[in-house]
């Protein structure tokens, strides 16, 4: 006995292969610090720093803990986590995610292993996106939004509800572990802004009117009877039977020197039985804090959107395609797509700076700064 009040003893498995070691023992006067020291020792002993991708860590090497805590003052011993029951969650999940955040930033003059790799991969993706734009341009795509940059004005969490052993998730590149915003999400929020602009212009307010407008925009065929704004929306974003002419690219971050990328947040559901077991909500239930990983405020993302000129030309050659829609395509061509570029920039900017993207936007997450700049 070394005189410290709390003793944590047990094993930690990182993943289902290897990384299993003899019992680890940690002592401290504070239970929380004893747990943190226990996990630090397990991390160092396992040589887990050889894993350079957060995605790989989350997919294959989430820690499984089998340990007990002894209170030498009260002479009591309790199970912290057990292989026979829950083996990660609560404070162990927080300790694990804190370690991920720690390894994703500078400590003193030393960069964490994840920080080095994410910064390196962000440079690679900057090059890959540039090459992707060039290749698409050679395939008759017009660049409508060219590497425009917006900075997060609040925490960002895309993919929070995706399946994950940690209960919550964050969209990361499946190989390189770099956070990004999927193109499908960007297209969705831009389309949403365009939709509500049309609804406002047409003075559609009731639920029934909104539902009919949705059907007209997403289910009905492109027709000469459609108004100009509705035709533009269908041409750009598509319908059930027509592929839209806009192409959104995934948005990747531009990591600055010494910039922290991630930080933890917590949500605290108060009625666990109501949400998970269909029970009546009651004040007698204990709050259930859930720690989750987010992209930090102040991270710059780069956005790119292109227009399919090849298919637009085919539309103009199609004798059966509605003439009113052809006229819109011709007008875009005549002004060099400048009007189209302005519309797309406005939709995306309004979506990201006013409504947000990802999870928990009603609570202010996923909002970007108003300033758009270009490389």
What positions do the PLM features span?
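Basic, Gly/Ser/Thr-rich N-terminal segments that form RNA-phosphate-binding interfaces in CRISPR RAMP
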Residues: 1-375
């Amino acid at each position: 006995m070394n005189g410290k009040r709390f003793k944590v003893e047990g094993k930690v498995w990182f993943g289902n292969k290897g990384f299993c070691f003899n019992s680890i023992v940690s002592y401290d006067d504070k239970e929380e610090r004893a747990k943190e020291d226990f996990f630090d020792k397990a991390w160092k002993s396992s040589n887990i720093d050889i894993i350079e991708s957060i995605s790989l860590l989350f997919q294959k090497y989430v820690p499984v803990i089998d340990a007990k805590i002894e209170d030498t003052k009260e002479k009591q011993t309790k199970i912290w986590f057990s292989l026979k029951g829950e083996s990660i969650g609560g404070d162990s999940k927080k300790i694990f995610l804190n370690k991920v955040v720690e390894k994703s930033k500078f400590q003193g003059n030393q960069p964490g292993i994840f920080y080095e790799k994410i910064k390196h991969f962000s440079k690679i993706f900057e090059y890959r996106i540039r090459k992707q734009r060039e290749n698409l341009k050679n395939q008759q795509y017009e660049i409508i939004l060219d590497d425009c940059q917006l900075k997060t004005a609040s925490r960002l969490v895309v993919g929070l509800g995706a399946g994950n052993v940690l209960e919550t998730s964050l969209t990361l590149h499946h190989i390189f572990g770099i956070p990004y915003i999927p193109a499908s999400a960007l297209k969705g929020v831009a389309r949403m802004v365009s939709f509500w602009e049309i609804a406002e212009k047409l003075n559609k307010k009731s639920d029934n009117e909104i539902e009919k407008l949705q059907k007209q925009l997403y289910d009905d065929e492109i027709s000469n009877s459609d108004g100009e704004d509705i035709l533009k929306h269908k041409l750009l974003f598509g319908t059930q039977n027509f592929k839209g002419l806009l192409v959104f690219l995934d948005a990747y971050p531009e990591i600055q020197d010494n910039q922290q990328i991630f930080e933890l947040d917590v949500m605290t559901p108060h009625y666990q039985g109501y949400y998970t077991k269909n029970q009546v909500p009651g004040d007698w239930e204990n709050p259930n804090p859930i720690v989750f990983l987010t992209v930090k405020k102040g991270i710059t993302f780069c956005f790119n959107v292109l227009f399919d000129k090849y298919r637009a030309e085919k539309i103009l050659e199609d004798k059966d395609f509605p003439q009113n829609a052809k006229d819109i395509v011709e007008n875009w061509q005549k002004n060099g797509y400048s009007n189209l570029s302005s519309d797309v920039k406005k939709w995306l900017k309004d979506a990201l700076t006013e409504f947000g993207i990802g999870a928990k936007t009603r609570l202010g997450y996923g909002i970007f700064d108003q300033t758009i700049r270009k490389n």
